[in-house]
């Protein structure tokens, strides 16, 4: 069976996901077969595996860092919020239904066999399992039925690294308070604490680190710097949306829907030096972009209503009539159509039908069975400015409850309006390059001036940079002693 180490945090966004990815990469570089694991993840940003299972993207990133194929066993329970008090529950990659938060809380221990089966299966195949917790183990109101933090650590007998975020302040209180709120048994599981997202001279921290070790009774296992790496992890979501980029040579405006999902669909455009990708949630901020993109959403009808009430729908329609390129993905694609109906209340929005934006001749009906599959092929029948896509390969995945009449092929177009059900459709560098070349031609600027790069080599380099920082920041001899149960 595999050795294991678990990364828990003092709070959400402490940097657990990225640190786990970095540790996966370090261990891979050191010659180990390593796999990530998170028993329960709550996220709208999901991925479809080769066998059609749905899992959280954080574990996909960690699997990529480890150099292995993403597998739903790495994230056996995925919760996708549908309302403020309920989620769609996905177990082993398949939808089980929608549950209110309290009902799920009462029933989640019934899922322990699924969690353990997934973990034990991975542990038989790999040398090391890097486990990520969720939120904080100090949420004492949730400890009784916990299956993702100390509850899971007990089930799989995992040693724990506790991570605190110094960038938001109060890291010593975070770490000491979290340790203090654990039972004696669980405190013994904490083998080291990590100060994460540090900026500055470590020497300034040393007196505090020494006192922290004395108070907690465990060693400081590392001080990891604030990382400037370009990796699609969930902890970067608020930072990504918070950027107020000024328009560059090519300006792309992405609509920041309230229930946005798979925001990483547009990440490829961010990596060109002279392309700006702005997330917009107010009509006055739309300005005059070269392309408007409408992302996927967990609640198409509710977000279409928001788009209408905010004035953004009218602004998008006006821009489209003036020749601006508009591109919708999944839920955004459905919104661009004429009509959406939900007779079975799949989205539980309290609305059975709604008119769409009327920019594509599309009729969408939501059904109970979810489409979830990887897809790839060659573009054909693409008209208009992006016609150069024809003959080029694409790869991605579909996750949606709705079926749309008139939807043909991977990309449906009418004039300057385009739509697709395929998440990740821009990930192939040739696809992103072709779209940007077309936008450059329309604008009369040189594509070469955008700054080009090798996307695959770039991604691998980012994982290596992450590993370099994690290796330098962590006490790796201590980490290996923890893995070998010598601490």
State what each model feature region is.
Residues 333-334, 426:
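Short active-site segment of divalent metal-dependent hydrolases/proteases
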Residues 1-320, 325, 342-345, 368-369, ...:
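Flexible phosphate-sensing "switch/lid" loops adjacent to ATP/NTP-binding sites
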Residues 330:
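Catalytic nucleophile serine of serine hydrolases
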Residues 337-391:
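A conserved active-site-flanking secondary-structure segment within enzyme catalytic domains
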């Amino acid at each position: 069976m595999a050795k294991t180490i678990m990364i828990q945090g003092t709070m959400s966004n402490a940097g657990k996901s990225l640190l786990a990815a970095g540790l996966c990469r370090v261990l891979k570089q050191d010659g180990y077969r390593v796999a990530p694991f998170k028993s329960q993840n709550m996220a709208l940003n999901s991925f479809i595996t080769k066998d059609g299972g749905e899992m959280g993207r954080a574990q996909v990133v960690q699997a990529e860092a480890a150099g292995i194929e993403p597998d739903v066993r790495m994230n056996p329970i995925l919760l996708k919020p549908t309302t403020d008090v309920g989620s769609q529950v996905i177990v082993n990659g398949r939808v089980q239904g929608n549950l209110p938060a309290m009902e799920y809380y009462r029933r989640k221990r019934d899922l322990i066999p699924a969690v353990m089966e997934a973990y034990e299966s991975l542990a038989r195949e790999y040398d090391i399992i890097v486990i990520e917790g969720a939120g904080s183990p100090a949420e004492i109101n949730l400890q009784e039925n916990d299956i993702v933090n100390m509850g899971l650590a007990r089930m799989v007998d995992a040693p724990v690294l506790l991570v605190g975020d110094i960038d938001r302040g109060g890291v010593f209180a975070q770490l000491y308070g979290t340790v203090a709120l654990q039972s004696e048994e669980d405190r013994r599981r904490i083998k080291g604490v990590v100060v994460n997202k540090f900026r500055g001279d470590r020497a300034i921290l040393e007196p505090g680190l020494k006192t922290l070790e004395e108070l907690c009774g465990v060693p400081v296992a590392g001080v990891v710097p604030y990382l400037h790496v370009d990796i699609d992890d969930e902890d970067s979501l608020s930072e990504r949306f918070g950027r107020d980029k000024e328009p560059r040579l090519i300006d792309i405006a992405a609509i920041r829907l309230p229930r946005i999902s798979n925001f990483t669909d547009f990440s490829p455009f961010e990596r060109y030096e002279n392309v700006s990708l702005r997330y917009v949630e107010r009509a006055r901020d739309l300005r005059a972009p070269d392309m408007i993109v409408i992302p996927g959403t967990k609640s198409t009808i509710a977000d279409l209503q928001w788009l209408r009430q905010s004035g953004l729908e009218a602004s998008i329609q006006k821009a489209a009539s003036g020749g601006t390129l508009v591109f919708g993905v999944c839920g955004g694609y459905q919104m661009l159509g004429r009509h959406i109906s939900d007779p079975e209340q799949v989205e539980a929005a309290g609305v059975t039908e709604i008119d769409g934006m009327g920019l594509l001749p599309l009729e969408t009906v939501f059904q109970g069975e979810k489409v979830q599959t990887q897809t790839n092929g060659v573009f054909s029948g693409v008209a208009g400015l992006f016609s150069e896509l024809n003959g080029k390969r694409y790869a991605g995945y579909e996750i949606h409850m709705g079926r749309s009449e008139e939807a043909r092929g991977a990309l449906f177009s009418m004039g300057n309006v385009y739509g697709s059900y395929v998440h990740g459709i821009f990930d192939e560098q040739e696809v992103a390059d072709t779209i940007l070349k077309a936008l450059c031609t329309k604008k009369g600027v040189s594509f070469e001036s955008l700054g080009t790069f090798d996307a695959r080599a770039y991604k691998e380099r980012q994982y290596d940079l992450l590993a370099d920082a994690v290796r330098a920041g962590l006490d790796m001899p201590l980490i290996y002693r923890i893995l070998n149960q010598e601490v």
